[in-house]
Amino acid sequence: MVLLAFLCAAALAALARGTIPPPEEAARMARFVLHNCDWGALATLSAQEGLRGRPFANIFSISDGAPGPGGGSGVPYLYLTDMEISVQDLEVNSNASLTVSLAQTPYCKKHRYDPQNPLCAHIIFCGSIVKVNDSEAALAKKALFTRHPEMESWPKDHNWFYAKFNITNIWVLDYFGGLKIVTPEEYYNVKP
C-alpha cells in the first residue's frame, strides 16, 4: 500500500511539474496521457431500442498498468459486466472509440487550460473491445485493481470480466493546428 501511494504521488508530481512529452512526440504523448488517466469516455453504436445505430458514450475506469513514471503497457484494460448498457452494445458490435484527456489530472487545472484547449492533451482511440484470454487475465486484473482497488469488492453475481481495447487507430490532440495520427505500431514501440 505504501508503494502504491508512492507511485501515485510520483505520477501526480510529474504531471504537476509539467513533464509531459513535447508536441512533436505524438506517440509518446498518447502513451503518457493514457497512462495518467484513470477513466475514459467509451463510445459505442447503440443496440438499445429507440437508440439503435446512434452513438452512445459512457464513462469507464481504465488502466494500462500501475501508476507511476515509465509504467504501463499502453493497453487500455477494462472491468466489465454484461449488465452494463454499453457492454450490451458491444456484444452486438464490438467497435468503439475511447477518449482520454489530461483534463482529469492536475496538469490542466494547474496551467488553467480549459478541457477543450488542445494544450490540455486528449487522445482518441478507435478499435474494438475484446475479452482477454486466461493468460492475460492476471495482467489485466493487476493493472485494474492496482488503480481501482474498489473493483475487487464489486458484486460477484454481476459476472465481471476483464477486457481490453484493441487499438486500430489513434488521434492525438495536444497542440494547436489539428489532430496528429499515430499508428498502433508507433504507439506500442515508443518508450512512455
Swiss-Prot record:
Keywords for this protein: Glycoprotein, Growth regulation, Secreted, Signal
UniProt KW Glycoprotein keyword: yes
Keyword Nucleotide-binding applies: no
InterPro entries xrefs: CREG (IPR014631), CREG_beta-barrel (IPR055343), Split_barrel_FMN-bd (IPR012349)
Domain of life the protein comes from: Eukaryota
Classification via Gene3D superfamilies: Electron Transport, Fmn-binding Protein, Chain A
GO CC annotation terms, alphabetical: cytoplasm; extracellular space; intracellular membrane-bounded organelle
Signal sequence residues: 1-18
Subcellular localization(s) per the UniProt record: Secreted
Cystine pairings recorded for this chain: none
Residues carrying sugar: 95, 133, 166
Family: Belongs to the CREG family.
General function of this protein: May contribute to the transcriptional control of cell growth and differentiation.
Protein's name according to its UniProt entry: Protein CREG1
UniProt organism field: Gallus gallus
Gene from which the chain derives: CREG1
